[in-house]
């Protein structure tokens, strides 16, 4: 497996231009006095958290919010070690992560913030328009390694074209979800190109005529001029395109999924973290839509806000993803009527 490491991306507010005229030391002192909120994890959730951080910092110039990208798994590792305040996650916390947090005394508040359509993409020149979950397994599955190397091996009507496979790395929540929903937890082939950075996957597929990959819908929306999204055949046998509408109506299964932030109970005691998380939940609906996600119903954000303010810790998912679930299924899992 070729694994490409992402550069760490961060959202931050620059010091006011007027301050640049002052000497270096006052600038450093002013910066040091700013309160800090730290988040890390999913590249899929990054656009939402980045958008929220930017808007929050416009209104709270005394608070600096950093948003890193290390994949959902990487974010949970840092979170359970007490290194960050918030973990961005494109899947629920796993049982082993629950245990890792427990061992370090890290209690957490689980907050769903939006729904995503995991999107399968190919090169713009590829004539394939739709694909089944079985065909996806035949392309990405462990058994395909060094065997399925041409599109025509997947289906006789597919083009005679070398197959090049791109996928998120194993620290990615998007990888975990795809592995569970499509590959029955058997893992991906070892001869693909993997990266936690979705932009690297975009570049790979857009430059490779036989390329195929998958990532969150927002990255497809941002790069749809370079890529082609495939319709995925759902449980009713209908080929359905990834879209906000098809997530809302529940037809884009099994690749529609909720995304989350997890807030450390200890961090939530800090006024700057409380202020940021409250702002996040108040604005996630509007901002998630702007960056290509499907907002949750208003009652879901109200319930999440109540959960946060009442300090209700733990997970309702028992270490499992909501595979093939709709927004209504998420609300039921969260106990929201």
From Swiss-Prot:
It is found in: Cell inner membrane. It comes from the Bacteria. It holds the Pfam family PBP_like_2. The keyword Protein biosynthesis does not apply. One of its GO terms (molecular function) is phosphate ion binding. InterPro entries: PBP_domain (IPR024370), Phos-bd (IPR011862), Phosphate_ABC_transporter (IPR050811). Its main location: membrane. May be involved in the system for phosphate transport across the cytoplasmic membrane. This is Protein SphX. It comes from Synechococcus elongatus (strain ATCC 33912 / PCC 7942 / FACHB-805). The gene is sphX.
